[in-house]
Amino acid sequence: KAVKRASDGAVWRDRKGIGWLDAGSHEAWDYVVSIARESYNVGFEELNFDYIRFPSDGNMRDIYYPFSEEKVLTDPDFGKAKVLKNFFAYLDSQLEDLDMPISADLFGMTTTNKDDLNIGQVLENALPYFDYIAPMVYPSHYPTGFNGYQNVNAYPYEIVNFSMSEAVKRIREFKEIKASTTPNAPYLSKLRTNQLRPWLQDNDYPVPYTPEMVRAQIDATYDAGLNSWMLWDAANTYTRAALENVTLENQE
């Protein structure tokens, strides 16, 4: 089920030495579903799916997808984005009976890019199948020069506000199109502005993020018309000062 090296058939690993499941493996899909159901059975209140994508770093010239290869390489109308869209639809169909929200983490630039970033993630392909979408709009993860900002870490408000404002526009446009073309689609009720719930940066990579920088991202989220967000720090040390007097400023 693993992604393989094209050169010798061994397990392919990224720069961190981590192996990857082939996103096109239906057996892997069933394995993920089984873990999700077991998580529900033991009492978790939400299922959040992360790393639901194709690899993005490592020796990409020596990579082979045993289950996705034919679809990814031989059919220009299929590709990585369609493989993942099919996976998202499968998750939804297999977990729709669970009385709990299902959410998905996407790269931050899925809110501003219309292509799949070569990892298979397209915002509109995920919207019909999850209760919440969490773009990881960490300012430090944007490339130098993004939207004209040479030092992205110096503009946490601007990066987050622009990214999430674009996502809000896209979800409204997507819902309008789908409502006119497939008015009876069951997923239309999922398509709402506050389906968007971004991950914001509260860590010190690659520079220390001050309370002001963290709060700027929170304010940027509210100003984009959203009312929920999450903070990320791998060390689980969060900036208390940034959270003082935080209220829901938008109830759309």
Stretches with model-predicted labels:
Residues 1-38:
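Active-site-adjacent "subsite" loops/lids of carbohydrate-active enzymes
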Residues 1-12, 55-71, 121:
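Aromatic- and acidic-residue-enriched segments that line the glycan-binding/catalytic groove
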Residues 26-40, 114-126, 209-222:
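Short, acidic/polar
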Residues 32, 39, 50, 133-135, ...:
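Conserved, mostly hydrophobic/aromatic
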Residues 44-45, 130, 226:
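A structural motif
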Residues 51-55, 106-110, 139, 202-204, ...:
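Active-site-proximal loop/turn and secondary-structure-junction residues that shape catalytic pockets
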Residues 69-106, 114-202, 248:
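Glycoside hydrolase catalytic-domain groove-lining segments
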Residues 208-252:
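Aromatic-rich peripheral "rim/lid" segments of glycoside hydrolase catalytic domains that contact
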